[in-house]
Amino acid sequence: MAKNIQAIRGMNDYLPGETAIWQRIEGTLKNVLGSYGYSEIRLPIVEQTPLFKRAIGEVTDVVEKEMYTFEDRNGDSLTLRPEGTAGCVRAGIEHGLLYNQEQRLWYIGPMFRHERPQKGRYRQFHQLGCEVFGLQGPDIDAELIMLTARWWRALGISEHVTLELNSIGSLEARANYRDALVAFLEQHKEKLDEDCKRRMYTNPLRVLDSKNPEVQALLNDAPALGDYLDEESREHFAGLCKLLESAGIAYTVNQRLVRGLDYYNRTVFEWVTNSLGSQGTVCAGGRYDGLVEQLGGRATPAVGFAMGLERLVLLVQAVNPEFKADPVVDIYLVASGADTQSAAMALAERLRDELPGVKLMTNHGGGNFKKQFARADKWGARVAVVLGESEVANGTAVVKDLRSGEQTAVAQDSVAAHLRTLLG
């Protein structure tokens, strides 16, 4: 007997019971994006490897350890996308979307990183990302954060996420801070773990992200990034904070928040939760004004964020059990008796024409009334439409409310109107 082939570790199947809640959550997210005037862009999941090395940074964990990179049959180095911003910028440059234009874009889909799989962290995971190009003021940074806050309200999780903000300044200010931080770390090298010692010279700001308690204690005495900000970055950050306060959005300034990718400048932010154990970041982003030029385009201000959908689904299920998937079926059409199936299928097609958007399932495979009503219940139907031999003969159908148990005989020409009233 052949051995079963299973999914790759960390790359999960999502079954019908799970995809229903995903679809409802994604629908909520997309509705909010539409209300802000953002447009969808669809991007390839495979890109040329140099794109990510140039955008993310060659000495980041993502590039050094986590990317799925391979050579194709032409010998070209390709990579499964580990994040969406680089590909979105590449597409914007390639198709002339960015020069002297303002763009508000969003995308959704799978990303890939070779990490140790655990709850909320997978090797194939799904992100929804937003990217805005051509706007440089703090007002658009604030709008993105306000958009995410509207998501949390719509999903019923506002009380379980908190906003952390920081400014990492201009490239020049960050370089000055990097020198001061390295000088401090060199004085305390014996207190650093091996990972931090390596990062100290390759990407010292990432030491601020260390989860090692001893390193975190040491960093209490380290130079503060805020002390090295240029005046323009200070004004930008102050403007952002004022806008958020006016909008009633609470935040905490976290001077150790730097983000893990090299392309960020000025604003960085994260929405975090205590409800998912160690996987606390739900949504994160910031400003990356130099990335378009770095990837071959003209200098273009840009800001964006990405959100992990697996973590969002886990969070919604953990803290808002009232947020349930929509039922698979609204109406179940029951047919019993000789020669009723063709009449039932014809009625079902007519009802689909007259009730667009309503989910109607026709019984197949026979079965008595009891079995068919059990199937209707299994699929979550609110209403059953019943056709027996007598109903077919006299041109009627029985409409049964499966919640109250009330049923009414209705002329087939009036079934759609009756259902419209019943379903609200």
Swiss-Prot record:
Q: Pfam families in the record, alphabetically? A: HGTP_anticodon, tRNA-synt_His
Record field: catalytic activity: tRNA(His) + L-histidine + ATP = L-histidyl-tRNA(His) + AMP + diphosphate + H(+)
GO annotation, biological process: histidyl-tRNA aminoacylation
Q: Which UniProt keywords apply?
A: Aminoacyl-tRNA synthetase, ATP-binding, Cytoplasm, Ligase, Nucleotide-binding, Protein biosynthesis
Q: Where in the cell is it found?
A: Cytoplasm
Q: Can you name one GO molecular function term for this protein?
A: protein homodimerization activity
Reported EC number(s) for this entry are: 6.1.1.21
Top-level taxon:
Bacteria
Cytoplasm among keywords = yes
Quote the CDD domains the UniProt record gives.
HisRS-like_core (cd00773), HisRS_anticodon (cd00859)
**Cellular compartments per GO CC:** cytosol
Its quaternary structure? Answer: Homodimer.
What is the similarity comment for this entry?
A: Belongs to the class-II aminoacyl-tRNA synthetase family.
Q: Which NCBIfam families match?
A: hisS
Question: What name goes with this protein?
Answer: Histidine--tRNA ligase
Q: Which organism is it from?
A: Escherichia coli (strain K12)
Q: What lineage is on file?
A: Bacteria, Pseudomonadati, Pseudomonadota, Gammaproteobacteria, Enterobacterales
